[in-house]
Swiss-Prot record:
SUPFAM superfamilies: S-adenosyl-L-methionine-dependent methyltransferases. GO terms for cellular component: cytosol. Belongs to the class I-like SAM-binding methyltransferase superfamily. RNA M5U methyltransferase family. TrmA subfamily. GO terms for biological process: tRNA methylation. The gene is trmA. Dual-specificity methyltransferase that catalyzes the formation of 5-methyluridine at position 54 (m5U54) in all tRNAs, and that of position 341 (m5U341) in tmRNA (transfer-mRNA). One of its GO terms (molecular function) is tRNA (uracil(54)-C5)-methyltransferase activity, S-adenosyl methionine-dependent. This is tRNA/tmRNA (uracil-C(5))-methyltransferase.
Amino acid sequence: MNLAAMDPSNYDAQLAEKKRKLSEGFAEFAPPELEVFASEPAHYRMRAEFRVWHEGDDLYYYMFDKVLDAKVRCEQYLPASTLINAIMTSLVEELRPNHSLRHRLFQVDFLSTLSGEILVSLLYHRQLDEQWQVEAAALKQRLSSQFNVNIIGRARKQKIDLDKDFVVETIKVNGQDLHYKQIENSFTQPNAKVSIKMLEWAIDATKQSQGDLLELYCGNGNFTIALAQNFNRVLATELAKPSVGAAQYNIAINNVDNVQIIRMSAEDFSDAMAKKRSFRRLEGIDLDSYNCNTIFVDPPRAGIDDETLKLIQGYERILYISCNPETLKDNLQTLSSSHKITRFALFDQFPYTHHMESGVLLERK
């Protein structure tokens, strides 16, 4: 983390530099003009993690600054949501004098929402006992006078939920409220307002679609729920069990009735589609009945494996969201032989860092 780089007065300049890098880096694929979606310059991150430093009676949050090569005390944190910044102060003031809650505490994680819920995870280098649970419950009650908060305690092979281990986010996408269960310690989009722009862009990019949608790496259904309106049916895959559970929950609370989630990896699904192997998890699902002309992928930073790339090339339209321009560029070396880029976007999910979230719509040549 480079804390000095987080200067809102430099936001436009750093975004312009990202635009230049992405445009120049993908020029060989002759994409259309880059669509740029900016972030708020401050208080844009809905998640934050802090280490905890103990110094006598004092106790405080810190981060490690790679540029300074030193730990930096954090009373407030500019990228974090206003809700995280508000509870940071109240929480640390509660922890300092409380031996049971502070003893061997080494990290605090926050997961907040635009809808006002916040989840606090306290991580310890010791096993948590009954006294900890009593003190944590009292802490939650005191904080609840100001915040809609839940607390989780974690230690090695131990997790204690005082109430629940998730928040429910509500966002407005093209005027429609969408609800998402977000589970502690599972992936969620960190920049909620930019995530809304991503969803709206994806909806617009697929609005003229026909037939069904195949989605790989669907996570908690973030895009699945939003895109379902543009297709007859959606078939989505995800490997992580907590994310599949959250996706099923999100399908239900959003009253979406045309989505089928399958718990399996993209690689295994590629084998199933190629009829190389049969899978018990696909019993009762007729893959041949789906008429998927469009495929949506939002892979991890490592990008897409070769076999899955071959699968993807079989579709007329490919919507690809990437958190790593290098692996996207590598994958496009293959995909560009059969498809051309017709939409190209930069989403500034991670201001003041080198990370760039991008999106491309590819259509068969």
